[in-house]
Amino acid sequence: MELLGRYINGNFKTTILSDGTKIRETEDDEFLPTFAENMDIKICNFCDMGCPFCHEGSTTDGKFGDILNEKFINTLHPYQEVALGGGDATSHPDLIPFLQKLKDRKVIVNMTVNQIHFEKKQELIRRLVDEKLIYGLGVSLVNPTEKFIELIKKYPNAVIHVINGVLKPSDVEALENNNLKMLILGYKHLRRGDDFYS
């Protein structure tokens, strides 16, 4: 397990390890940060999937955010964590230069992708992980095939996102006994997700 970094944020010291472990220490009774430890950033509203349950409402007409904005990037602190998503974050034309800027600032990046994009864009995903442009990878599960299970095992910091109400219990059972990390998320009644549920 590799040390990613240590930093002081307000009245506490934080240590972050390569497996995602985070240790916070303070001599006080409460943690009082001076800046956000992590943030979610939706970098685009473009996606070619059109999943009926998607709460993001992203479409093929969706726009790409101005992620190379230096004014924003310069507000980020070393070892601050950002979770990138979209739409399809992997489709953003400035993704690699943006991630390189964040890496240069020692910002720790996690990214969420749809299972279909994860499988189709393996060359890009592998590059992002191998070059340490991202550390954590969230993959929104669509169909737990054997191919998917074997593929995701190659990413030690991958977490499978299971959306309650979208998948069947048998889909979750298919993941059992594979030594995989799983996060069960609540269903969001927003945008297309609201129509799908009703």
Predicted feature residues:
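C-terminal capping segment of individual leucine-rich repeats
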Residues: F46-C47, T75-P78
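Canonical Radical SAM [4Fe-4S] cluster-binding loop centered on the CxxxCxxC motif
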Residues: D29-L68
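Basic phosphate/pyrophosphate-binding loop/patch that engages nucleotide-derived ligands
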Residues: K154-P156, E176-N177
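Core AdoMet radical
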Residues: N38, G57-D66, P78-H92, L102-K121, ...
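N-terminal accessory interaction module
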Residues: M1-E30
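A C-terminal junction/extension of Radical SAM enzymes
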Residues: M1-R6, A174-S198
